[in-house]
Amino acid sequence: MSGMSGSHAVSQESEHVLFAVRGSCDMCKERIEKAAKGVNGVLSAHWDKDTQMIHLQYDPQKTSPKAISKAIAKVGHDTDMDKADKAVYDKLPACCHYR
């Protein structure tokens, strides 16, 4: 008997999505993935610097790609759906500037 008390069959209810996220370095990768994983319902987030794409696994009952995109934009990275505020973007380290 495994401790199933707080867990659900989330993997069966989860969905995958890919969308573009602009960034330029490993610091960007860390920031982008941290922002995505900070959204309740995100199970995994992997951003690829070369393709500029993020692969997400999430629980659609708890969040949506749009909500995750907004969280990423709030930390300074443009996505297919949302543009980061210029003031936030300007505060990124120089190596993270992609515009």
Residues covered by each model-derived region:
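Bacterial Sec-dependent N-terminal signal peptides
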Residues: 1-13
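Short, surface-exposed ligand-recognition loops at beta-strand->loop->(often short) alpha-helix junctions
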Residues: 19-28
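Short amphipathic alpha-helices in soluble, non-transmembrane regions
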Residues: 32-33, 67-76
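Short acidic amphipathic segments
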Residues: 36-48
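A generic structural motif
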Residues: 52-57
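Helix N-cap motif at beta-to-alpha junctions
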Residues: 59-65
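Conserved short beta-strand edge segments in small beta-sheet-based binding/regulatory domains
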Residues: 76-88
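Short, low-order "capping/linker" segments at domain edges
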Residues: 90-99
